[in-house]
Amino acid sequence: MTEQQPVAVLGGGSFGTAVANLLAENGVPVRQWMRDPAQAEAMRVNRENPRYLKGIRLHDGVEPVNDLLATLQASELVFVALPSSALRSVLAPHAELLRGKGLVSLTKGIEAQSFKLMSQILEEIAPQARIGVLSGPNLSREIAEHALTATVVASEDEKLCQQVQAVLHGRTFRVYASADRFGVELGGALKNVYAIIAGMAVALGMGENTKSMLITRALAEMTRFAVSQGANPMTFLGLAGVGDLIVTCSSPKSRNYQVGYALGEGHSLEEAVNRLGEVAEGVNTLKVLKAKAQEVQVYMPLVAGLHAILFEGRTLNQVIEHLMRAEPKTDVDFISISGFN
């Protein structure tokens, strides 16, 4: 990648726009592609993304575009910030163009039909590409407002990690590296489910002890499931695990938290999602995660409980009561209890 070669950001949402701005602030020319030509034109003219990041000026180095073919041809490093439901359909027709490029997924979701993570879909579409993911406690608006933030880029390709660090690392945005791509990406996808529960708990006025219990048991569930799928449990003690879980489960700026809060206020799921106006990946992830947990026989009572609330008519109070009545287990799965007398 030459100094003047643009970096591509695919997606016109809040996180894609925040990352595009970060790149441009570091002197990197950026082409931000979006499917809606009207959105691209409005962003070009007004230098703002009013639907997703209202009030944040779009850096002059970001060029909103609508031509995907030209964008991919011009860029060797591509950040993919497309909804999980659209990623395959958008990129599969251009598989040949992706050969050899660095593809970094920013999307925290799971494909419903296959239970594949976004980087696995990218790998399937473009097996000759260099694949990575970016994940962590990264609220888009705070990044755009230059709040001090850290993230993780994960890839088996060390040079790709270094390349991402070089273009993204800045005064207010620190980029760490990891080789556990699967664990980092799985942490980012799974925590969205628990943010819905956390938002509901706050709306219903539950105490700090309860919220702390929910977040901690969520981390236990996430780690238990991830290890069953081959991830490193230590990854979940870092930014992409507990870090992302804390911010997503405690901030009203989190989209999945907002959905949970609306549900706790008595809105239907459809009303909660419509009120948000953006994609809340946690709702889609919940369905496939519950099915997968049953398939591989991993104990995930919070996932089962939230599914019962959203799709089976249960209440959060009923789910927590069931959780409290369940047989007590050890606190941390990966610590031996052989020393008990």
From Swiss-Prot:
<protein>
    <recommendedName>
        <fullName>Glycerol-3-phosphate dehydrogenase [NAD(P)+]</fullName>
        <ecNumber>1.1.1.94</ecNumber>
    </recommendedName>
</protein>
<keyword id="KW-0444">Lipid biosynthesis</keyword>
<feature type="binding site">
    <location>
        <position position="108"/>
    </location>
    <ligand>
        <name>NADPH</name>
    </ligand>
</feature>
<keyword id="KW-0521">NADP</keyword>
<feature type="binding site">
    <location>
        <position position="254"/>
    </location>
    <ligand>
        <name>sn-glycerol 3-phosphate</name>
    </ligand>
</feature>
<keyword id="KW-0594">Phospholipid biosynthesis</keyword>
<feature type="binding site">
    <location>
        <position position="35"/>
    </location>
    <ligand>
        <name>NADPH</name>
    </ligand>
</feature>
<keyword id="KW-0520">NAD</keyword>
<comment type="function">
    <text>Catalyzes the reduction of the glycolytic intermediate dihydroxyacetone phosphate (DHAP) to sn-glycerol 3-phosphate (G3P), the key precursor for phospholipid synthesis.</text>
</comment>
<feature type="binding site">
    <location>
        <position position="281"/>
    </location>
    <ligand>
        <name>NADPH</name>
    </ligand>
</feature>
<dbReference type="InterPro" id="IPR008927">
    <property type="entry name" value="6-PGluconate_DH-like_C_sf"/>
</dbReference>
<comment type="similarity">
    <text>Belongs to the NAD-dependent glycerol-3-phosphate dehydrogenase family.</text>
</comment>
<feature type="binding site">
    <location>
        <position position="15"/>
    </location>
    <ligand>
        <name>NADPH</name>
    </ligand>
</feature>
<dbReference type="InterPro" id="IPR036291">
    <property type="entry name" value="NAD(P)-bd_dom_sf"/>
</dbReference>
<feature type="binding site">
    <location>
        <position position="191"/>
    </location>
    <ligand>
        <name>sn-glycerol 3-phosphate</name>
    </ligand>
</feature>
<keyword id="KW-0560">Oxidoreductase</keyword>
<feature type="binding site">
    <location>
        <position position="255"/>
    </location>
    <ligand>
        <name>NADPH</name>
    </ligand>
</feature>
<dbReference type="InterPro" id="IPR006109">
    <property type="entry name" value="G3P_DH_NAD-dep_C"/>
</dbReference>
<feature type="binding site">
    <location>
        <position position="136"/>
    </location>
    <ligand>
        <name>sn-glycerol 3-phosphate</name>
    </ligand>
</feature>
<dbReference type="InterPro" id="IPR011128">
    <property type="entry name" value="G3P_DH_NAD-dep_N"/>
</dbReference>
<feature type="binding site">
    <location>
        <position position="279"/>
    </location>
    <ligand>
        <name>NADPH</name>
    </ligand>
</feature>
<dbReference type="InterPro" id="IPR006168">
    <property type="entry name" value="G3P_DH_NAD-dep"/>
</dbReference>
<dbReference type="GO" id="GO:0005975">
    <property type="term" value="P:carbohydrate metabolic process"/>
</dbReference>
<dbReference type="Pfam" id="PF01210">
    <property type="entry name" value="NAD_Gly3P_dh_N"/>
</dbReference>
<dbReference type="GO" id="GO:0046168">
    <property type="term" value="P:glycerol-3-phosphate catabolic process"/>
</dbReference>
<keyword id="KW-0963">Cytoplasm</keyword>
<keyword id="KW-1208">Phospholipid metabolism</keyword>
<feature type="binding site">
    <location>
        <position position="14"/>
    </location>
    <ligand>
        <name>NADPH</name>
    </ligand>
</feature>
<dbReference type="GO" id="GO:0046167">
    <property type="term" value="P:glycerol-3-phosphate biosynthetic process"/>
</dbReference>
<feature type="binding site">
    <location>
        <position position="244"/>
    </location>
    <ligand>
        <name>sn-glycerol 3-phosphate</name>
    </ligand>
</feature>
<dbReference type="GO" id="GO:0005829">
    <property type="term" value="C:cytosol"/>
</dbReference>
<dbReference type="InterPro" id="IPR013328">
    <property type="entry name" value="6PGD_dom2"/>
</dbReference>
<dbReference type="GO" id="GO:0051287">
    <property type="term" value="F:NAD binding"/>
</dbReference>
<feature type="binding site">
    <location>
        <position position="256"/>
    </location>
    <ligand>
        <name>sn-glycerol 3-phosphate</name>
    </ligand>
</feature>
<dbReference type="GO" id="GO:0046474">
    <property type="term" value="P:glycerophospholipid biosynthetic process"/>
</dbReference>
<keyword id="KW-0547">Nucleotide-binding</keyword>
<feature type="binding site">
    <location>
        <position position="108"/>
    </location>
    <ligand>
        <name>sn-glycerol 3-phosphate</name>
    </ligand>
</feature>
<comment type="pathway">
    <text>Membrane lipid metabolism; glycerophospholipid metabolism.</text>
</comment>
<feature type="active site" description="Proton acceptor">
    <location>
        <position position="191"/>
    </location>
</feature>
<dbReference type="Pfam" id="PF07479">
    <property type="entry name" value="NAD_Gly3P_dh_C"/>
</dbReference>
<feature type="binding site">
    <location>
        <position position="255"/>
    </location>
    <ligand>
        <name>sn-glycerol 3-phosphate</name>
    </ligand>
</feature>
<dbReference type="GO" id="GO:0047952">
    <property type="term" value="F:glycerol-3-phosphate dehydrogenase [NAD(P)+] activity"/>
</dbReference>
